[in-house]
Amino acid sequence: MSGLRAQRLAARRAERRRAAGRGAMVAAACVVAAVGSITGMVSALDDDRGTDEARPQATRSPSLRPKPAVPSAPEPSPPPASPSSAAPSPSRTSSKPSPTPTATKTKETVAASARLYRYPDSQVLDWVADNPTDPRNEVIKSRIADHPAAVWFADYTPSDITARVSAVTSGGSGQGRVPVVVPYAIPDRDCGGASQGGAPDLDAYDAWIDRFAAGLGSEEVIVILEPDSIAQSDCLSSAERIDRFASLARAGRVLKEANPKARVYYDAGHSEWNAPDKQAALLGKAGAASAGSSDGVFSNVSNFNPTNAEVTYTRQVLDALDAPAGLGAVIDTSRNGNGAPADGEWCDPAGRKLGRPPTLSTGEARIDAYLWVKLPGESDGCKGAAGAFSPGYAYDLAR
């Protein structure tokens, strides 16, 4: 590693330590209680334990605890060479680990997501750079680190949010690629659960969204607006739900007015949560059916349900929403390559695999993109600290 590269990495880590010290808000946004025994995180290769220690990062993706789901049949990971092919039928025979990727497969997979932006400041990229001789390095690099993933903004810091969002969107526009950003600061998020946090009230949230929108720039960007904010709103009173949905509708308008090329998607939960008509009714109250505030819905964030189930579900939601013809859906495929675990486990469950690579060309009507919204390898809280990168977990997903 060159001296300049080492200096840059050291400076970036120092900035992360300063960011982590800004207070408990980030921790509250990202921490999920560890479940089960830490002894379950032994590396497949049983190498130096030090390389498995996770480093916290201020903008990592929080762990969203999914609603207990009916077990899903696993979905085979399709060949990366044909990401636009229709979702295959579920098959129980697909639970075998995927083979180690070849150089050809890596090249084809990267091409599938070429229009999406890979933000260069991430835990997985740091780990790959810091551990070049680790025997897991090539698999993690080629199958995870080389692919674009969403950038989360989970801490309520109004003073610098515009600059932080702009750093991502300007990086994407500079390369002619599309970044994916996730504002995650709605008050009372996670219904007081492990990922609770966010803005102190809706007035503060509205002001924060204004500043977030100011960083969107003028080129294409995808906004995954507040995961779980609609599907998981049962804990609110009727009046509180009305107020939240009004703020979400306002947020969509503000984001699209700030950047007309921004594509804003609203929370549809996932296929094993609310029924499509119930979810559509909630979405309609939050502005998701209006072309002035919405480009459609997203599903399966941080979850494991197979892509074909989510394709069917999101189309049903859009139909029930009576949405304008141009509205579509995006699906998180980051960890759904082997379907949901039979026991409903949500915290770093064993046997999960990477799903379809991120792409804006799905080959499916009304499905605008397959995205990696949850960053593969970032723990739910059982394989490592919640939201922190675990190379052992990443390797298990990727191999």
List each model region and its residues.
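Surface-exposed cleft-lining segments at the edges of enzyme active sites
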Residues: 148-156, 195-200, 230-241, 265-272, ...
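Surface-exposed substrate-engagement region within the catalytic domains
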Residues: 126-140, 144, 258, 273-392
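N-terminal carbohydrate-binding/catalytic regions of secreted carbohydrate-active enzymes
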Residues: 109-211, 215, 375, 379, ...
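Hydrophobic membrane-insertion alpha-helices, especially the h-region
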Residues: 27-38
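Terminal targeting segments of Actinobacterial cell-envelope proteins
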Residues: 1-23
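Substrate-binding cleft of extracellular glycoside hydrolase catalytic domains
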Residues: 167-264, 282, 293
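N-terminal low-complexity, Pro/Thr-rich disordered segments
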Residues: 44-134, 194
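Hydrophobic faces of well-ordered beta-strands that scaffold small-molecule active sites
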Residues: 112-120, 126, 150-151, 179-181, ...
